Amino acid sequence: MQVVLGEAPCPLCILQRYALLLIAVFAFIGAAMRNKGAITLFEGLVVLSALGGVAAAGHHVYTQFFPEVSCGVDVLQPIVDGLPLAKVFPLVFQVDGFCSTPYPPVLGLSLAQWALVAFVLTVILVPLGIYRNRQRKA
């Protein structure tokens, strides 16, 4: 959507992308593990990454509902742009917009709201799946 529709990502958008990337990396590594302790560690890292995503997406949704809390200058921009992936993959991980900029909704929700739903579902469903799998094996 960023390239096709010209929707510039803000610092909170980029932080949500980092959270999604971490969830994917930890999930793939955890899926490749055979040691129960290592699997548990990576399951925990997936949930922690999703909690970080909940924080970023939640604040983004709040900023979109109450744009007056935004000062017009995103103080996170230099921090997010200073992260290594912003230099390696600038199209994906470099800040170009403001967090309070409204974009047209997708199926009634903004992208930040969709991201929040996805992160919350991850936080709920991953531990639930872990619990169910461990109960089956016991």
Predicted feature descriptions by range:
Residues V4-P11, Y62, P105:
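Membrane-interface helix caps and helix-loop-helix hairpins in membrane proteins
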Residues M33-V54, I124:
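Interfacial segments of alpha-helical transmembrane regions
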Residues I23-F26, S49-H59, L121-L125:
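Membrane-embedded alpha-helical transmembrane segments of multi-pass integral membrane proteins
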Residues F65-S110:
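Extracytosolic (periplasmic/ER-lumenal) interhelical loops and adjacent juxtamembrane/interface segments
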Residues M1-V3, G52-P67, L85:
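C-terminal TM-helix exit segments that contain a strictly Trp-centered aromatic cap at the helix terminus
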Residues E7-L21:
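Loop-to-helix transition at the N-terminal end of transmembrane alpha-helices
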Residues M1-A8, A27-G30, P90-L91:
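Immediate flanking context of iron-sulfur cluster ligation sites
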Residues Q94-A138:
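A hydrophobic membrane-anchoring alpha-helix module
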